[in-house]
């Protein structure tokens, strides 16, 4: 990308954000309007003992569990049951796999670019997953 295009993009972004700041200064201030949002009003919540007797109008419910919290719960359940444990490869197994890959690449050199592309896609997907998990952990 040329530097002039980049500078034009930065200037356009700056101008767009400044317009919203200037329009926010000119907004009329509305006072003494009662919207019925009194802070001192109390909301009725269901008691801990009779939560099943309360109607849905008086009961405060949280939204459903998010995707990541459900996923985190499933992973935790599998880890606690011991299903997630994997065996580590020893040196002999690693050498065997390396030899098999090397013979495949020697037989047909056209397969190496496909293997390389697959590894790049795998790396990108894992990196994106780690970023998403990191952001989710920081937000919660």
Curated annotation (Swiss-Prot):
GO terms for cellular component: extracellular region; host cell; membrane. It is a single-pass membrane protein. Induction: Expression is induced during host plant infection. It comes from the Eukaryota. The keyword Membrane applies. Keywords: Membrane, Secreted, Signal, Transmembrane, Transmembrane helix, Virulence. The chain crosses the membrane at residues 119-139. A motif (RxLR-dEER) lies at residues 43-61. Residues 1-24 form the signal peptide. Its main location: secreted. It is found in: Secreted; Host cell; Membrane. The RxLR-dEER motif acts to carry the protein into the host cell cytoplasm through binding to cell surface phosphatidylinositol-3-phosphate. Belongs to the RxLR effector family. Effector that is involved in host plant infection. Contributes to virulence during the early infection stage, by inhibiting plant defense responses induced by both PAMP-triggered immunity (PTI) and effector-triggered immunity (ETI). This is RxLR effector protein CRE9. The gene is CRE9.
